[in-house]
Amino acid sequence: MARGRRFITLVGCAAILAGLAVASPAATAARADAIAPGAPGAPSYFDLARKDCVGTATATGSKVWYTVADGVLSDVYEPTIDNTNVSTLQYVVTDGSTFTDLQTRDMTYTVAADPTGMACTVTSTDAKHGFRLITTYITDPASDTVLMHTTLRDTPGSDTNLSSLHLYARLDAHVNGNGGGGTENAGANTGVVDTSAGSPVPVIYSTNTVTDAVNRDYAVPTYMALDATSDQAASVGYEGTASDGLTQLDATHTLTSYTSAPDGHIVATEDVTPASGHEVTLALGFGRSQAQSVSVAKTSLSQPFVLTAVRYLLGWAAYDAGLRRPAGQASLDRNYYLSANVLKASEDKTFPGAIVASLASPWGQSVPAGVTSNGEPSYFGSYREVFSRDLYEIFTGLMADGDVATARAATLFLFDKQQLPSGAMPRNSLLNGKAAPDTGGLQLDETAYPILMAQESGLGSNTALWQDHIRPAADFLVANGPSDGVERWEEQTGYSPSTIAAEIAGLTAASAIAASHGDTARANLYQATADDFQRNIKNWTVTTTGPDGPSYFIRLSKTGDPNAAISYSLGNGGPSVDQRSVLDGGFQELVRLGELPVTDPDIQASLAIVDKNISVSTPSGTGYYRYGNSAADGSADGYGDCYQPSQDSCTTPGAPWPPTDSGTGHLWPVLSGERAESDLAEGNTSGARSLLQAMINFSSGVGLVPEQAWEDPDLAASPYGSDPATASIGFTDGKAAGSASPLSWAQAQELRLIASLGAGHNVDTPAITTARYITSGPPGSLPVTITAPASGATLTTATTTVTGTTTPGSAVSIEAADSTTGEAATVTSTTAGSDGSFSASVPVGFGTNALTVTATTKGAGEVGGGRST
């Protein structure tokens, strides 16, 4: 029934497209010298990250993605999801004598999507001159082409003569991820007008495949051709100069054609005024050569747009028909399927399972696209890379909607492509799993989550995966946990509730996997370590001397003592604050991951304190800061678009974060979802629904959930042409801020919250941890004392004797991990004697060795652990 209804909707959409009107002839462009003047043009920048809509075909052979931002075509990725080629493709309209209007400068817009969310229709309105441009965006399932179908209409009550208007398409490019221009002119593009098929087709290309991302070995020469069903004249030139078509049209309302513009920041302008009627289709075709890109574009245009659109939409309808539909949530179908499709659309098509953190790069409009780094053009991957933690969150959405195949592909990507020889996962990677220029230090939750993913997706039974990947990851956690590297916000070291919650879940999953492979020693080691972390989580992260209550979770403790009067800088231009005053909702992961009950007194107290101190009410609903001490004093987080007054040091309201690495952090919609899951765990369904609605309201465009939402008074956009380093993009209280939208993590959170409301419980809470820590209460503990070797001792042989005491008859597991050489950890097992003593010869490496000893009593449900390094 649902499938039939969705198909009828698509046919209705096709019928609407088929009935669109058609447009009028334009004047012939003047001719001039073939080579454009003004090289290399103004500095190029990347793209606005607050997207209105995104899309790609479900067909894996069509390796092109489109995005729309500020009402016009924005980032277009091809042939991989991290390779951006377009700054903007937008229309310029002129009457040829009195005005020239540009979409982003002179028009307002609204945006809508089809039921899948993958086809986007933008209505741009020029109220002053009485016309509208209605444009639908898709990609061709059969090729690497973005298609735009546009109808020119008058506004209601207008007497505008549409036949007197001339329509131009202006393409501002940064092909192959760089755009040149300015002083450095790095990654310069070249533009030509191709006439091989008769009509003029502008082509912009870059054959450079070398950037400062030395591991990005999959880059290829990229050519981009702009063709149209009505193409009468075309020109290429340098942005911001006399050869820029916009400059010409603004000055004289006519286009002067140039056929060649080598090495610079290239713009192409094409007269696409329809020969008859008021309708035109544009094709942006890609290839590895000029001829191929032109051929690809023309082939896509040879098919009626309506038929291509139907094929495109039916691909997504078929995908959605295979998903699990939440019970009783029909009113949320659009949000649910949009979220599911955004997650699937965020997967690269060359590297299966490589699902990026976002189809946008934060504040791209302020990041230069024509500069060098280490002597090469600077690669700007940013969120279009793979982060293990984000991929886990995406995984939970995929599992919730029933796309187990993609969930497994994501898991295998992390283990097969990204995992380091030590067993750990890096902060992030390129699409091939190799280190990116911004790959930084380790984060233990990013090593823990993939183990949980393997267990929950049914991959734990794979022997090779266990031996070569899961076991080294779990060994690394035992040797380095509970505190190593930074927490989930990637800024602070210390003992973090959210990080340790992930470790507990990952090690519990590893224990079950080890047991299934007959490795009892490791099964005991992993579970005992997880139990030790669960037993001590409050000792490390709950303060009893803080200002906000008698006992509550803090963001993190720097040393494992949450009562210590230690202050630290929050970073990004934020203040320095006593650790006992810094709040964060990360402790809720202990509930979501089945390690503490929501009724736990410290959980309850902390929820109330977080609600009081780091939540903000907006017209869209309640949102939460990442962390802070007092929302009443303004944001203490410096990662975001600047606003004053706040606790941060930025000075220009609306300025983007990147140029100074400082700003003002805003509300994170994903944290409204996190708080909603705690409500749902308490049985507070109405509270959870209210927070879900806030997430929906915070969205940009057609329902894309952003990384951040603005919670301050409305702030207007800076005038067109303002300095990108300081310009405001315009903000509305309770709507998306400027960092990135959609955020894949947030889209997954929205999806799984809808699924959880349908199920009546949190669908991603692991059964394995719930059974161990909640259903029967946490297991008891055993005393473990290590008597030799002493911590810090120098060992001169390849083995050492580890001795100690514990409960008589306990099974003892001893892990030795050499953190210097990175050799595989070893696990030795023995049994405590009748007096509780144990002794075992353990192999050690030539570097610094971490020795971890655990003891387990069979059948008693009691475990204990000790640690010596």
Which residue stretches match the model-derived regions?
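C-terminal capping/lid segments that line or modulate ligand- or cofactor-binding pockets
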Residues: 33-80, 394, 430, 437-454, ...
